[in-house]
């Protein structure tokens, strides 16, 4: 038996498989977050926390500070890192990340800091006054077990997710829907800028993007009920108007919350002619 005589090449060692996580922790490092996004691909990741303080604590660590990734991921812009410990550079061309957070007014102001940062306009907000009326905690037939309720919805959504991964959808919008979208957000932008804060402009523009994303999600749900293997599906007027109505409400909440934030932590000096 003849054996090849050569020195071992350690570069030929098998590559360790990367685990793919759909739900990731808000308590993570910047490099670890990029790894998660790279492994997840187009499926993406979801980061959820019921306390904004968790995000504040994580971003305050030296290994954290991934605020720029949150901003880029909102528009699926490329994120990357290149450290010696990682070996090859890690590049995520189109990161997909959903972020859901909740907290108090004080936590909100600490996390977003100012309107100039850009993180604020990338979020959809919903706020409400605290209900000071006591609600009965006694068990009864009318009480809904929220844990079981959302678990059942989660199972339904998981089945939908697995099937639709094999049947991607191209969502289309009619010319009349695009026209309405232009008219609606042009008017919203005009009204927002009347207040004299330029930062409101980015909020409205990104709300326009969010509105179409929401309409696309509704269309995929509609496709699931109708013909789940269709390659192309047009957004119905009902779903489009529903998405626009929701966005109108979210914009009002965003504008309300924006009044509690400064335009910038350190206002830049006014520009003037150099010569």
Predicted feature residues:
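Phosphate-handling catalytic cores of nucleic-acid transaction enzymes
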Residues: 1-275
